[in-house]
């Protein structure tokens, strides 16, 4: 009998237990090849609606559909074995009512195999989060800078940098915890506020443009790989410049084709005798 054991996929309770027990690593993934590469290094793979901007060139995340989220989450599930996979509920798929949120969240999980959904919002979404969690759908909350509210916020602007705004974000975090979210993404807020929330909340706080004191960090993978162009948010660290490597590879290929150096004999199939 083979001694090989299937690799354990991290679960929602596994993520919850990481509060105060080492930093969580979260990365976005939208495809099978990227998920396969990131899976050994990430605790959470987030299939974010950011795919609308990153992959499809949309100006915001508002044009992403539930069908797109199902398809890309399926691709990530096929490429991963270890990480807990969380899929975003896209704009207008959950804000109308808790029942609408349940219907679409249930479809997203059932059709993709993901472990949890992520939704944006604070106090106004507490009832919805509670409704989902009580019916078996784990929720990762998202507070602070919320991309689906880009029009209401007047752009992608940092939040919680004045006392009034900070208190509003703090109340949002507490509301998401009361609603039963297993963790919360805190995006684009003042560092002292993110630090305070990480200390005050009993659930893991995952920062993006927040604070090193958070229980984990998440970045858009294309940003850290250098595939997002020259303009990136100030909180991004580029760990590679794959854009330059891709440009060089494409240049060399084009040159070899035009000079008839590619393909060579070793790339071609011989006739059978």
From Swiss-Prot:
Top-level lineage group: Bacteria
Keywords, comma-separated and alphabetical: Cytoplasm, Magnesium, Metal-binding, Pantothenate biosynthesis, Transferase
Cofactor requirements of the protein: Mg(2+)
Enzyme Commission numbers on file: 2.1.2.11
Primary location class: cytoplasm
Reaction(s) catalysed (UniProt annotation): 3-methyl-2-oxobutanoate + (6R)-5,10-methylene-5,6,7,8-tetrahydrofolate + H2O = 2-dehydropantoate + (6S)-5,6,7,8-tetrahydrofolate
Record text on cofactor binding: Binds 1 Mg(2+) ion per subunit.
Pathway linked to the protein: Cofactor biosynthesis; (R)-pantothenate biosynthesis; (R)-pantoate from 3-methyl-2-oxobutanoate: step 1/2
InterPro entries for the chain: Pantoate_hydroxy_MeTrfase, Pyrv/PenolPyrv_kinase-like_dom, Pyrv_kinase-like_dom_sf
Binding site for 3-methyl-2-oxobutanoate: 49-50, 88, 118
GO cellular component, as recorded: cytoplasm
Tagged with keyword Transmembrane: no
Subcellular location: Cytoplasm
GO annotation, biological process: pantothenate biosynthetic process
GO molecular function, one term: magnesium ion binding
NCBIfam families attached to this UniProt entry: panB, PRK00311.1
Subunit structure: Homodecamer; pentamer of dimers.
Function, in words: Catalyzes the reversible reaction in which hydroxymethyl group from 5,10-methylenetetrahydrofolate is transferred onto alpha-ketoisovalerate to form ketopantoate.
Family in the record: Belongs to the PanB family.
Alphabetized HAMAP family for the sequence: PanB
Protein name (record): 3-methyl-2-oxobutanoate hydroxymethyltransferase 1
Source species: Pseudomonas aeruginosa (strain ATCC 15692 / DSM 22644 / CIP 104116 / JCM 14847 / LMG 12228 / 1C / PRS 101 / PAO1)
């Amino acid at each position: 009998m083979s001694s090989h054991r299937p690799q354990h996929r991290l679960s929602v309770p596994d993520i919850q237990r990481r509060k105060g027990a080492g930093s969580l690593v979260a990365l976005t993934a939208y495809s099978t090849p990227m998920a396969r590469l990131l899976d050994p290094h990430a605790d959470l793979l987030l299939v974010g609606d950011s795919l609308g901007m990153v992959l499809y060139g949309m100006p915001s995340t508002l044009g992403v559909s539930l069908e797109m989220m199902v398809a890309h989450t399926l691709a990530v599930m096929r490429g991963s074995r270890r990480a807990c996979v969380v899929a975003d509920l896209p704009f207008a798929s959950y804000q109308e009512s808790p029942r609408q949120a349940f219907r679409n969240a249930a479809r997203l999980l059932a059709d993709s195999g993901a472990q949890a959904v992520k939704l944006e919002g604070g106090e106004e979404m507490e009832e919805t989060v509670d409704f989902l969690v009580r019916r078996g759908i784990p929720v990762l909350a998202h507070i602070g800078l919320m991309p689906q509210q880009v029009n209401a916020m007047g752009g992608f602007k940092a939040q919680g940098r004045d006392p009034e705004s900070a208190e509003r974000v703090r109340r949002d975090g507490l509301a998401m915890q009361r609603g039963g979210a297993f963790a919360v993404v805190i995006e684009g807020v003042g560092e002292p506020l993110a630090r305070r929330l990480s200390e005050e909340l009993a659930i893991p706080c995952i920062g993006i443009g927040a604070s090193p004191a958070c229980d984990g960090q998440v970045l858009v993978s294309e940003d850290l790989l250098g595939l997002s162009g020259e303009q990136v948010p100030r909180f991004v660290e580029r760990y590679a410049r794959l854009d330059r490597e891709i440009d060089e590879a494409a240049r060399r290929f084009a040159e070899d084709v035009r000079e008839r150096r590619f393909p060579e004999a070793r790339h071609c199939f011989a006739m059978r005798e």
